[in-house]
């Protein structure tokens, strides 16, 4: 059986015989006379089951703007094909949000708050969740990788323009990350974490916010949920919006103020938000991909990217 035949079998198991199929990113839109479905692929059963459970918890806690997961005529909700897993969801009639639109950014921020509030008291031990809440460990790993890259570059006989630029800025990046670690340690971050750990979405990209025809923001794709704290989710979203808006600090203030309107941040949480955004994330990530993972990346394009991000990341 090929993939198309497999999809056809899935659709027919829902009592649908005549339909059109379109691919959008990593999902398939099934359009029939009676209804529209979405078929999504999952690389692991864990992500699939976590998604189902988190949707159930959100609905129970009155978080309305999410997709439904559908069972077929045999009361099955997922299907396996070549070690991949597929499930059917309701189709949200709308479009991806525009993260250069201030009004839509604010709507997304409120949706993030509502998601956190709906999920903050969930303790479902049947869910297998990645715990990536140890910021200090992650930042220390970044420093280790930067030293590794620095050591490699010191052994290169003839440095390229890219090599020189990266080498000249490594110490500055290490210093910034070290300062963040010091702030976390001085404020007893581990104690804070033990008291404030919740389930986070962890994938708050603009394509996971759908602006419905009813002008409501729908949150989708819960396959990447993890354990962290609410500042983590918000700061990661803010960073993505910030980078897409040419490093306009006003959008950071807008995001913080909207969330803070509903949930009053403590002084330390404000410090966490600011610290996360001071992390030279792109400098570390791009360097790691090129120098440690040995990804085949055009050096000139990479150099231009690094220069663009470093204007902000290494000069705060």
Where do the model's predicted regions map?
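ATP-binding glycine-rich phosphate-binding loop
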Residues: 9-32
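ATP/Mg2+ or Mg2+-diphosphate-binding catalytic cores
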Residues: 147, 283-316
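ATP-dependent phospho-/nucleotidyl transfer catalytic cores
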Residues: 20-21, 42-45, 97, 126-199, ...
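Active-site acidic catalytic loop and adjacent metal/ATP-binding pocket
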Residues: 29-31, 69, 181-230
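Active-site activation/catalytic loop segments of kinase-like enzymes and analogous catalytic loops
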Residues: 231-264, 277-296
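Short, solvent-exposed loop/turn elements at beta->coil junctions and helix N-caps
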Residues: 25-27, 72-77, 189-190
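ATP-binding pocket architecture of kinase catalytic cores
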Residues: 35-127
